[in-house]
Design a protein with these regions (language model features):
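Phosphate-binding active sites in nucleotide-utilizing proteins
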Residues: 211-313
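PAPS-dependent sulfotransferases, especially Golgi type II membrane carbohydrate sulfotransferases
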Residues: 100, 116-119, 131-143, 151-217, ...
């Protein structure tokens, strides 16, 4: 009974970690997790939960350690195997992860997430793919999330095999089903971005703003799937830089200082009146908990484009890099990605067009009111002339050039994004112009972008 009591105490202690993570107190959370892990012993359930919490703290190495111990204790538990595979993907151990997912599917053929994750790990080939098995699996599945995952897996593998017609048909089915499961109105996000631009007008930037004077971080931002992970890896291959990945610390610091609000509009209006120095300090105090070991760090949270007006006032020494990509390639890359959370606008072409147009308007606004603060990087230019554009990026960060920035694919740091497998490869142009394979299917999207003011020359 004593051991059961100890286990109950450990689970209770673990319950106190989640609020720390949600509030951005990562350092405190990691300290508690380490103490709980030290006493975890042979409790596979506790080790599983520890791994999940480490993952939420952006520590896939620690998560993998816990999941591996859990797998040793319960080697035929599909959940343990799946979670270990996810941690190994973030660590770049793609072959091991694929083998684990093979085991998951053998043990539990109904695990649609395992099918979908496995499809993304490499380019499928005529001699090595899972299309036939996926077609059988999708015939058996009920409408819902599992159907969505299998449809996305089929779309990915058929695209790899050079069958764009059937690939897009499965993608549309999966996206339509996912959209039907969401309660989301893109108009809310569009209105919020317009309100941000209104509140953070030119007059606000005329006010004196000391901000937090410490050397600032590098913010890499843009729409997801626009090349943010690639640029993050290029910069973090420098010996003076490490990446914290996609964290929410700036938004969390903002919400803590703003206090309880009456919704997005109220938060936006309150944020303009915050003390910039206090906001900058709150953010830097929060990220200190990640235990950095290098002088400079990267915050690669794509949605930070919403906060550029706050960032430049709160952190006057911050470096901001914004990724841009051909509008149709950008939207197609979003549309074909099954996000575990976030990006609810990405499952409908009309929503995608509306969100992209609002994003472009807001970025145009930031360039107008804070000229020179944002370095725009064109994904296509980076792919076409890697060294020249990489040097411009490193220079913008105030760093001396290092050749390691050209071999970013050898960077062993974790990458826990949808591009985790791709950034382990040298730069390539396979995805440039990929939208052209689907020009007919994407024409409604292109028409909406043209109607929204995008120069038709950008859409060819």
């Amino acid at each position: 009974m004593a051991s059961l009591a100890v286990q109950d105490d450990a689970m209770a202690a673990l319950g106190g970690v989640s609020p720390l993570i949600r509030s951005g107190r990562i350092g405190d959370a990691l300290s508690r997790l380490a103490a709980i892990e030290a006493g975890a012993g042979g409790d596979a359930r506790l080790l599983q939960h520890l791994g999940e919490h480490y993952t939420h703290c952006g520590k896939p190495d620690a998560a993998a350690r816990c999941y591996r111990r859990a797998v040793e204790l319960t080697p035929d538990d599909p959940r343990c195997l799946y979670n270990l595979s996810a941690a190994l993907i973030a660590l770049g151990r793609i072959g091991e992860a694929e083998a684990l997912l093979d085991r998951v599917i053998a043990l539990d053929p109904q695990d649609a997430d395992a099918w979908q994750n496995r499809s993304t790990l490499r380019r499928q080939t005529p001699g090595s793919n899972h299309v036939a098995d996926l077609l059988k699996a999708v015939e058996r599945v009920r409408p819902g999330p599992a159907e969505v995952a299998l449809c996305y897996a089929l779309a990915k593998e058929l695209e790899d095999l050079g069958d764009p017609h059937h690939s897009f048909a499965w993608l549309r089915r999966g996206a339509d089903r996912r959209r039907s499961l969401l309660s989301y109105r893109v108009e809310t996000d569009v209105a919020a971005m317009a309100e941000i631009a209104r509140v953070f007008g030119a007059r606000l930037f005329d006010r004196p703003s000391a901000g937090c004077p410490e050397p600032g971080p590098v913010f890499v931002m843009g729409l997801p799937r626009s090349g943010t992970t690639l640029v993050d890896r290029i910069i973090s291959s420098h010996s003076d830089v490490e990446s914290l990945g996609e964290i929410n610390d700036f938004a969390l610091a903002l919400m803590r200082l703003a206090g309880a609000t009456g919704g997005k509009g109220d938060l936006i209006r309150r944020s303009a009146d915050l003390d910039p120095a206090a906001l900058g300090r709150a953010y830097l105090d929060s990220v200190a908990g990640y235990g950095r070991t290098r002088p400079m760090f990267i915050d690669k949270t794509p949605a930070n484009f919403l906060y550029v007006g706050l960032i430049v006032r709160a952190l006057p020494n911050a470096r901001i890099i914004h990724l841009r990509r051909h509008p149709l390639d950008s939207c197609y890359a979003l549309y074909k990605t099954l996000f575990r959370m976030g990006c609810p606008y990405s499952y409908d072409l009309g929503d995608l067009a509306a969100y992209m147009l609002a994003h472009r308007r807001l970025m145009d606004h930031w360039r107008s009111v804070a000229p020179g603060r944002v370095l725009d990087v064109e994904y296509e230019a980076l792919v076409a002339d890697q060294e020249a554009v990489s040097r411009r990026i490193i220079d913008h960060c105030g760093l001396d050039w290092q050749d390691a920035c050209l071999t970013f694919h050898e960077n062993t740091a974790p990458a826990a994004t949808a591009s985790a497998a791709q950034v382990r490869q040298p730069i390539h142009a396979r995805s440039v112009g990929l939208w052209r394979r689907y020009a007919d299917q994407l024409e409604p999207l292109a028409a909406a972008l043209r109607a929204g003011g995008v120069d038709p020359a950008e859409l060819v």
